[in-house]
Amino acid sequence: MSNKVHLGHTARKRFGQNFLTDGNVIDRIVGAIAPDNHHVMVEIGPGLGALTEPVAEAVDNLTVVELDRDLVERLHHHPVLKDKLTIHQGDALQFDFGQLSVPGKKMKVFGNLPYNISTPLMFHLFEFAEQIETMHFMLQKEVVLRLSASPGCKAYGRLTVMAQYFCQVVPVLEVPPHSFTPAPKVDSAVVRLLPYAVKPFPCKDVTVLRHLCTTAFNMRRKTLRNNLKHMLSDDEFEQLGIDSSQRPEQISVQQYVAMANMVCDKKA
């Protein structure tokens, strides 16, 4: 049998499917998620149910978002899960997670994410950060390093700044390729994202922050002065106490927010 077949389902490359099969890893992830009935539990990409089954055992209801119609059909007919699941068939990148919110209940979101959409999905989920208590995701290890990087690191970039603006980022565990079927060609890791109830560095307009970060990191090897010359002057960098001869990966989240707020003030 092909090593891409698990429980009778053939993994689809276009959906980035790698199914988690290591029981010890599954137990550790479920322990980190800490499922309960005090939150709206949401799984992205339940696949063949490796995380779905143990989480559903611990709660009255679990909402899942799955793109693959074949897997949705399996879940609808699952002898144990079908009565506990609320299933949304569709693309998580387009899904309105806000519709799942319940008064007085924040969401706990988790999933073994397809690596080919993990970064854009992070940016999409940040839009709903105020309605989310925790997020736990299996990601390519490289992405977890980017999420948790510090200024000055090679991994530090636009994703780092935006993730750490919205959330506290905590790497949980590393997961080797043999924990999956089929085995991916890269190492994986689980990360915990804890959205801030009160942001440490509030931004006046997140759209401006997002645009500023994109512009700054488009040419990583060039200086802030070069990359942001159409947004901030040398005098304004000086007012902020930021050395404009530095490269974008040398600038802290707090400094990016300060730059974005100055741009907002100029527009006002």
From Swiss-Prot:
A GO-annotated cellular component: cytosol
One MF annotation (Gene Ontology) recorded for this entry: 16S rRNA (adenine(1518)-N(6)/adenine(1519)-N(6))-dimethyltransferase activity
Pfam families xrefs: RrnaAD
UniProt entry keywords in alphabetical sequence: Cytoplasm, Methyltransferase, RNA-binding, rRNA processing, S-adenosyl-L-methionine, Transferase
Enzyme class: transferase
SUPFAM superfamilies given in the database record: S-adenosyl-L-methionine-dependent methyltransferases
Catalytic activity reported: adenosine(1518)/adenosine(1519) in 16S rRNA + 4 S-adenosyl-L-methionine = N(6)-dimethyladenosine(1518)/N(6)-dimethyladenosine(1519) in 16S rRNA + 4 S-adenosyl-L-homocysteine + 4 H(+)
Residue numbers binding S-adenosyl-L-methionine: 18, 20, 45, 66, 91, 112
Localization (cell): Cytoplasm
Family to which the UniProt record says this protein belongs: Belongs to the class I-like SAM-binding methyltransferase superfamily. rRNA adenine N(6)-methyltransferase family. RsmA subfamily.
HAMAP family on file: 16SrRNA_methyltr_A
Stored NCBIfam families: ksgA
Record function comment: Specifically dimethylates two adjacent adenosines (A1518 and A1519) in the loop of a conserved hairpin near the 3'-end of 16S rRNA in the 30S particle. May play a critical role in biogenesis of 30S subunits.
Protein name (record): Ribosomal RNA small subunit methyltransferase A
Species: Shewanella baltica (strain OS185)
